[in-house]
Amino acid sequence: MKYLAGDFDVVVIGAGHAGCEAALASARMGCKTLICTMNLDSIALMACNPNIGGTAKGHLVREIDALGGEMGINIDHTFIQSRMLNTSKGPAVHSLRAQADKKRYSERMKHLLEKEENVVLRQLEVIEIDVEDNEVKGVLTKNGAYFTTKAIILCTGTYLKGKIIIGDIIYSSGPSGLYPANDLSQSLLNLGINLRRFKTGTPARINKRSVDFSKMIEQPGDEKIVPFSFIHNKLDKDQISCYLTYTSEETHKIIHENIHRSPLYNGSIEGVGPRYCPSIEDKIVRFPDKDKHQIFIEPEGENTEELYVGGMSSSLPEDVQIKMYRSVPGLENAEILRTAYAIEYDCIDPQQLDLTLEFKNINGLYGAGQFNGSSGYEEAAAQGLIAGINAVLKIKEKNPLILKRSDAYIGVLIDDLVTKGTNEPYRMMTSRAEYRLLLRQDNADLRLTELGYKVGLVKEDRYNKFLNRKKNVENEIERLRNMQITGKREINEFLLEKGSTELKKPISLYELIKRPELDYFKVEPLDDKRPSLSDDEKEEINIIAKYEGYINKQLEQVEQFKKYEDRLIPKSINYLDIKGLRLEAIQKLEKIKPINIGQASRISGVSPADISVLLIYMERKDREN
């Protein structure tokens, strides 16, 4: 029987990575917030890989942190290994990645919600969204509880009509054996919301005692641990290693012999899977020329023997899986603790949302995370944060927070989802950001903390720390610009030792740092007035000095790009001739044949980076003609 159970400013449905950020943002901005979850023990659950960050995803975590979100702080408290990726490349693609103790990560996030003053946390299933005159009024639960509210944020993850698939075994379920949410989808359809089916998958978990690590390559954490959160100066921890192995010829043979039993290829799976995270059987079919694929063996925590077999997700039958996993060097005697599976679920076409993540046709209804067609914990958390912020700003009748593509990876993520839509689970990549040298992970606070402070998420002590860092960086750059270095004998000897050339005339230390063979750290012996700075401040100063020309060029591009919206594309263009275009972009452009740059830029799978490549090609052709 239906009964009135309470009144809230904001109701968040789902307590995964999107839901947690949405609820914490809403509560910390002063709104009374209800967060509902199917199971209190699955809050911030890492249903797939036990890590946070990675290429482009690390940028998102830093941006979440800079705006006042929780993910970066939580992983800093619960990581078991930390690595900075892509260090051999430029700073635009440096990405922090941390292995998580997945249970502690979940427990700490749950405890935060329990302690948060404006949060009420409940284990219950929402089955209906109540809307009158295109405006949300409340939610109804399976137990009959009705909660009135001004805003609802849907963060349902993979639970909506979730269906687990292992070979020919198919059953209704959420991730990791949890209950699915089978009733809410119909309520959304009744509201005129378009739903679709997506699919994702996860590999098996195996027992550590059954693994022969001597046949694998050890991957320890970095000696110097870099925090995700800007509030942490230094982290120390005994880290746990991951291990690298590869599929074998036998692995590929087993998969080929049983491919007819794969739900991916026999029609059992209807949902669209993630292009950039394919199952092992999909990889072997799609890349027949590759004789081996990387497999990462990753610990799931400090107090468990479970290991995650990264790179080997599958929906093959269990008997095939056992043979397949045991064909991998080091896994010959692997004990499978949890079988790999695929999961299908309902989600929306995100083009039904506007850039605030509110539904265009329903006031007060927001979507975030996998519900919006994205994949990944970090993408979900970023959307949850923005949806939570904007729900509160609307309640308070303030202007929304809309991040542009030139502001943040979060801006790229949301613009791609909302403007272009997606026909497959969307994953953030550095190649999707056309201004990635401006959107580095090291400067996320300089880009976004001011905004976080203005909306009320970044508190005074955090803001003062940010202002101090900003001032230190600006003052040091100014000092370097004004400090003149002359061609004294000892200075020229120092430069020659470093493989640089002698000075013929005075030069600022700032300009000297720009030389390819030098940097801010190497010129320290020439700088007796150098102030005491933190490691991250020094790194920031070095990047700004070294890449100033490129950074200024991208700032100009931000303004210039607007001019090309209506630029016509020649009918005779051959996209295969354009170096730098990704294969996916070539396929989509060839198929749709857009008539102008504006149309091309809105095609799903064609990134703004691809558009930049296309424009450069067209301009070169114009000059040649």
Curated annotation (Swiss-Prot):
A GO biological process held by the record: tRNA methylation
Molecular function GO terms recorded: flavin adenine dinucleotide binding
Positions bound to FAD: G14, A15, G16, H17, A18, G19
Entry superkingdom: Bacteria
Transmembrane segments: none
Keywords assigned: Cytoplasm, FAD, Flavoprotein, NAD, tRNA processing
Binding site for NAD(+): 273-287
Subcellular compartments: Cytoplasm
Pfam families the record matches: GIDA (PF01134), GIDA_C_1st (PF21680), SAM_GIDA_C (PF13932)
Named cofactor requirement(s): FAD
GO CC annotations, alphabetized: cytosol
PANTHER family in the cross-refs: GLUCOSE INHIBITED DIVISION PROTEIN A, PROTEIN MTO1 HOMOLOG, MITOCHONDRIAL
NCBIfam families to which the protein is assigned, alphabetical: mnmG_gidA
Family membership: Belongs to the MnmG family.
Function statement: NAD-binding protein involved in the addition of a carboxymethylaminomethyl (cmnm) group at the wobble position (U34) of certain tRNAs, forming tRNA-cmnm(5)s(2)U34.
Assembly behavior: Homodimer. Heterotetramer of two MnmE and two MnmG subunits.
Protein name stated in the entry: tRNA uridine 5-carboxymethylaminomethyl modification enzyme MnmG
Organism: Clostridium botulinum (strain Okra / Type B1)
